A protein has these predicted regions:
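Carbohydrate-associated surface elements
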Residues: 160, 182
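Short aromatic-enriched loop/helix-cap "lid" or pocket-rim segments at secondary-structure transitions
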Residues: 11-17, 83, 106-111, 116, ...
Length: 199
């Protein structure tokens, strides 16, 4: 497993930000993404990623030696659309599991009732300065360019997510497979409501 910024000491997890300079750059990217977003996004609880910063991974040893690349979370300064598209140069099969809506919107992670992702985003209700060519539309265009250069298969953990992908103007034509998240059925199992409240 390769991560952008590592928490903990698990030896099976490779940190892409090992070393003082790489760590500083990762923290800078993460903080810059968050603070710049505050300039453009209304004071709401809905997360919005600009994805202006990123890291090139095409020279990474682990990725070069990998049989397959499985992406999960690529935001907070990790993979901007430009660096995401570069992964195609590694000539590896790529699978991307979506855990929220960001990959197929102009920046929001949770779209609630907004349906602008059906038509190239723009006029984003989350932005302070919205309009037809606002940041959400520009982000959408960056993602469209990147996705046109990158071959990947989408995994959705729910039918709802798969249907959302199919409805999106960015990825509606991509193959999507539903693979539900796994859970410990010994721990998470149906209980009688009254009994569950006692636990």
């Amino acid at each position: 497993v390769v991560v952008y910024y590592k928490f903990g000491e698990n030896p099976k997890i490779t940190n892409l930000s090992a070393g003082i300079f790489a760590k500083f750059k990762a923290v800078f990217n993460i903080m810059a993404e968050r603070y710049l977003a505050k300039l453009f996004v209304k004071a709401v609880k809905t997360p919005f990623s600009l994805q202006w910063f990123g890291k090139s991974l095409i020279n990474n040893k682990e990725l070069k030696e990998a049989d397959i690349i499985h992406l999960h979370w690529v935001n907070h300064g990790f993979l901007s659309p430009k660096f995401l598209a570069e992964l195609d140069l590694l000539d590896k099969p790529i699978v991307w599991t979506f855990h929220d809506s960001n990959a197929f919107t102009g920046g929001c992670h949770v779209r609630y009732s907004c349906e602008n992702f059906h038509r190239q985003c723009g006029n984003c209700p989350l932005l302070k300065f919205d309009g037809k060519n606002d940041i959400s539309h520009k982000n959408w265009l960056s993602k469209q360019k990147a996705y046109s250069e990158l071959n990947f298969h989408i995994v959705a953990p729910s039918n709802w997510m798969a249907n959302s992908v199919k409805e999106s103007s960015l990825l509606g034509l991509r193959d999507t497979t539903v693979i539900p998240n796994t859970i410990e059925i010994d721990v998470f199992k149906p209980y009688v409501k009254a009994e569950a409240k006692k636990i």
